């Protein structure tokens, strides 16, 4: 970030040389870069995984700049909050769905999952899918997910919450209801303040609240 001559803050996005940063590429058991395959509606986005050691904590980062992806999808992670609402949705699918898939590939399983802001809300879609795949009903799965989920709201004003039109949301999330054991309308209603209101968009924050036992704000 820099300041202009009149004191305005300017955000600059520069290409990073990962070889000069305190960051390590995560490798698989064969010594190859670990790749997480994240399903969208009818195709996959392939993400590399990087690890940053923050004290005693490992921070894992997803990177779609992978030659297996289309040029459009390679840019998903180029810039935080960059692009249009479609790219924002693809980022949030990567963070939520891809985040849980990454933990599974790394063999990491925790008792509590903390959704820190609505951008990661879709973690609970994947968690429900996983429980249903194990043989649980949707009702059983969502109760387990709720009991082990905490959601933190950082921006408790209308402008701080992401809303997605049903058409756009369905373009990438249309395959998930069947895996969750519910209908498309059921999934949409989990993200609506007024379930059944067809004119209401899907809100990540509402979805996070509806799938978490505890909700707090900072």
Feature map (PLM): residue ranges:
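Catalytic cores of carbohydrate-active enzymes across secretory and cytosolic contexts
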Residues: 1-218
């Amino acid at each position: 970030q820099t300041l202009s001559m009149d004191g305005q803050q300017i955000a600059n996005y520069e290409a990073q040389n990962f070889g000069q940063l305190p960051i390590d590429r995560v490798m698989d058991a064969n010594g190859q870069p670990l790749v997480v395959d994240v399903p969208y509606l009818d195709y996959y986005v392939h993400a590399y995984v990087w690890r940053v050691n923050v004290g005693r904590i490992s921070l894992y980062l997803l990177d779609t700049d992978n030659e297996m992806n289309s040029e459009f999808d390679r840019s998903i992670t180029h810039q935080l909050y960059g692009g249009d609402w479609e790219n924002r949705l693809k980022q949030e699918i990567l963070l939520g769905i891809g985040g849980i898939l990454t933990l599974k590939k790394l063999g990491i399983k925790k008792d509590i999952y903390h959704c820190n802001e609505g951008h990661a809300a879709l973690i609970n879609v994947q968690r429900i899918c996983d429980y249903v795949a194990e043989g649980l009903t949707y009702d059983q799965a969502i109760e387990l997910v709720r009991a082990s989920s905490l959601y933190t709201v950082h921006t408790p004003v209308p402008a701080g919450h992401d809303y997605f039109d049903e058409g756009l949301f369905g373009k990438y999330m249309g395959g998930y209801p069947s895996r969750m054991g519910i209908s498309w309308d059921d999934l949409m209603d989990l993200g609506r303040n007024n379930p059944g209101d067809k004119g209401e968009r899907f809100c990540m924050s509402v979805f996070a609240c509806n799938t978490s036992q505890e909700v707090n704000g900072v």
